[in-house]
């Protein structure tokens, strides 16, 4: 399991990234951010991608249940 600080930072970055994606319409921005993170820290990249995926999955699940 990742260091709690890594998870916290990844969660913050995921929230910020998804907000920018909504504002700009760049649906794959998170992939570019993940690549930048991965160049420095594979651990941070994995935590960030996990944070993004869980948020996207939760949103899709919520949309499905709302139908």
Could you tell me what each predicted segment is?
Residues 1-25:
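N-terminal acidic leader/helix
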Residues 20-66:
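Amphipathic, hydrophobic secondary-structure cores in small proteins
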């Amino acid at each position: 399991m990742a260091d709690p600080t890594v998870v916290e930072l990844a969660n913050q970055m995921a929230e910020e990234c998804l907000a920018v994606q909504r504002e700009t319409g760049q649906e794959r921005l998170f992939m570019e951010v993940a690549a930048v993170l991965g160049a420095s820290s594979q651990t941070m990249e994995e935590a960030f991608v996990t944070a993004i995926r869980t948020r996207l999955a939760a949103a899709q699940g919520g949309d499905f249940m709302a139908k």
